[in-house]
Amino acid sequence: MKVLGIETSCDDCCVAVVENGIHILSNIKLSQKEHEKYYGVVPEIASRLHTEAIMSVCIKALKKANTKISEIDLIAVTSRPGLIGSLIVGLNFAKGLAISLKKPIICIDHILGHLYAPLMHSKIEYPFISLLLSGGHTLIAKQKNFDDVEILGRTLDDSCGEAFDKVAKHYDIGFPGGPNIEQISKNGDENTFKFPVTTFRKKENWYDFSYSGLKTACIHQLEKFKNKDNPTTKNNIAASFQKAAFENLITPLKRAIKDTQIKKLVIAGGVASNLYLREKIDKLKIQTYYPPLDLCTDNGAMIAGLGFNMYLKYGESPIEIEANSRIENYKNQYKRKNNEKNFSNA
């Protein structure tokens, strides 16, 4: 079965063709450079650019896969969570294709797509612990299957990637913040500043994260940095921030591994491409799986791959389904019961 995967939850316009849930025939992504001067994604610009680009990106994906649109068996599309305007563009495009081609459509949760991505590269047996790190999400989950996910902990404020972007903006390091901070940190001293690392002691927040304190502490160094008599460089600030940002992850992650007794770890999301983070994780001495770089960031392949499996198990989504920018109380919503409705159709 050939699945066309469409992902437009933020600022990347992504379309892919995947066969039988794992064989990637094409994986095309168009990143929107227009946001760089704003040091962040502008929702109105993102949705407009998706509208302009999605048809050409789809054509490129089909051409790369050597596949005619009539040969597509299923259309998978991200319907939640994300920027509502961007989601609507992708969802309406997918609906139009489904109706005109008389093909089934399956709507996919962006978070579950990221958690599925590593499975397209490595054969990983369930159960395992997943750590999702992206610009919009930071969470730890216990996975027993592609659709059996229990979120153990999540950020209570900023995501890890969002904190990188905001610090980079204040220090004029560039957007996106993650790769730019990683790059200049290589020439910095990570011990110049001791930024705060948040650890929760309450049972209900045992596996949770917080990045607002770290972000604020780093930004408060800005005035000292501007002082001409201060020898501190951007490299040192970036390196010190990066060190604290990833130390912030380690304690909750260790707790999850210890408490669940699960000895396999899967890292997903755009921040997973950070090599400094991978060095930190490798020190945990646990079997760890990373997706290739093109599956770390937003992509259509993960949506198509998960869509194949969701469709086989649950069937198609109703054509009336609407995009949803948020998932209220999502930590609890991902706890499934037997025969419960598909996440994507919730």
Curated annotation (Swiss-Prot):
CDD domains: ASKHA_NBD_TsaD_bac (cd24133). GO terms for molecular function: iron ion binding; N(6)-L-threonylcarbamoyladenine synthase activity. It is found in: Cytoplasm. Its main location: cytoplasm. Keywords: Acyltransferase, Cytoplasm, Iron, Metal-binding, Transferase, tRNA processing. Binds 1 Fe(2+) ion per subunit. Fe cation binds at residues 110, 114, 298. One of its GO terms (biological process) is tRNA threonylcarbamoyladenosine modification. Its cofactor is Fe(2+). Its EC number is 2.3.1.234. It catalyses: L-threonylcarbamoyladenylate + adenosine(37) in tRNA = N(6)-L-threonylcarbamoyladenosine(37) in tRNA + AMP + H(+). It is an enzyme of class 2 (transferase). GO terms for cellular component: cytoplasm. Belongs to the KAE1 / TsaD family. Required for the formation of a threonylcarbamoyl group on adenosine at position 37 (t(6)A37) in tRNAs that read codons beginning with adenine. Is involved in the transfer of the threonylcarbamoyl moiety of threonylcarbamoyl-AMP (TC-AMP) to the N6 group of A37, together with TsaE and TsaB. TsaD likely plays a direct catalytic role in this reaction. This is tRNA N6-adenosine threonylcarbamoyltransferase. The lineage of its organism: Bacteria, Pseudomonadati, Spirochaetota, Spirochaetia, Spirochaetales.
